[in-house]
């Protein structure tokens, strides 16, 4: 049931906050904080296959393997809402991955679905063009 006490502006702000916290935790290598930004099971569609994490156990480790040895940090280039309800926001996202020297490894587009489940906002799934 949709909670009309939450405005679309509040839902969008909550979803953007989730992404900001996700990237901060990712860059800090903080697996606990990173897990707080995700609902589990968590789904990622990329490279023609769906990856599913039932629990947060290997999420950071799996990311580091995907990003490669040259990865140092990532930044959000933009995160734009494309659809919204009081309990779910779809975001058009572009992020960049960088080496330690500041050179760009790549820029990638993705769609993130951030949802409020059991009164907690977190990313439920995404479709990404990143490796």
Give the ranges of each region predicted by the language model:
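Short, low-complexity N-terminal intrinsically disordered segments enriched in polar/charged residues
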Residues: 1-40, 56-57
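Short, well-ordered beta-strand segments in beta-rich or mixed alpha/beta enzyme
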Residues: 22, 34, 44, 88-97
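Residue-level recognition of beta-strand termini and adjacent short loop/turns
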Residues: 83-87
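Short beta-strand edge/turn micro-motifs at domain boundaries
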Residues: 105-131
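Hydrophobic/aromatic beta-strand elements that line small-molecule binding cavities or substrate pockets
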Residues: 76-82, 94-97, 109-115
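A solvent-exposed, acidic/Ser-Thr-rich amphipathic alpha-helical stretch
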Residues: 31-80
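Short beta-strand segments enriched in hydrophobic/aromatic residues
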Residues: 38-39, 95-97, 127
């Amino acid at each position: 049931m949709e909670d009309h006490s939450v405005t679309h502006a509040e839902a969008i702000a909550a979803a953007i906050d989730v992404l900001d916290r996700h990237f901060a935790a990712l860059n800090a290598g903080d697996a606990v904080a990173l897990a707080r930004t995700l609902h589990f099971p968590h789904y990622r569609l990329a490279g023609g296959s769906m990856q599913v994490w039932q629990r947060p156990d290997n999420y950071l480790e799996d990311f580091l393997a995907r990003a490669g040895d040259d990865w140092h940090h990532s930044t959000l280039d933009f995160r734009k809402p494309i659809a919204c309800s009081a309990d779910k926001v779809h975001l058009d996202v572009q992020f960049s991955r960088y080496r330690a020297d500041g050179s760009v490894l790549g820029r990638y587009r993705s769609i993130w679905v951030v949802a409020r489940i059991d009164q907690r906002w977190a990313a439920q799934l995404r479709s990404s063009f990143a490796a």
